[in-house]
Amino acid sequence: MQKADKRNEIIRSFRKFARLGLDNELLSPIQIYKKIDFLCISKRSRLDMLSVYDTLRLLWLNDEKSTIEAIKSVYFDKKAHRLTKHDISTQVLSLAQENHCDERTIYRRLERARQIYEKIREREELLLDELDR
């Protein structure tokens, strides 16, 4: 899979997580797991949502609140429309201006979140494969 395709797939997972209402901070982990189980039909979709949740938890535990804020501001746009060419860059620019930081800083935070997601997703898939044996 090409790098751009993988990036787009990860962004779709983050956006779906928000669209399903799983970004609600008042939900307990058990409620989130139950909601994922109820809302996601395929095993792949469940793994994607669990990976997003685990990414956010890991970032929160590492006190990377600025990265979580970037994810929520840029990826958790609950509008149902498909992303157009400049949606993400517009949201990044807006967030950079709000936080008085450089756009590259926001992009680095988002890249870090995608890398964490990718590693978590790979590990969860390996664990699931082992359980299926």
Protein language model annotation of sequence segments:
Residues M1-L61, E122-R133:
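N-terminal interaction/assembly modules
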Residues E9, S66-A70, R109:
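Residue-level detector of well-ordered alpha-helical segments, enriched
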Residues L59-A70, D77:
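Short helix-coil-helix linker/hinge
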Residues I71-S73, I88-S89:
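A short glycine/small-residue-enriched secondary-structure motif
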Residues F76-K78, I116:
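A short structural micro-motif
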Residues K78-R104:
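Helix-turn-helix DNA-binding module
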Residues L95, D102, I106-E124:
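DNA major-groove recognition helices of helix-turn-helix
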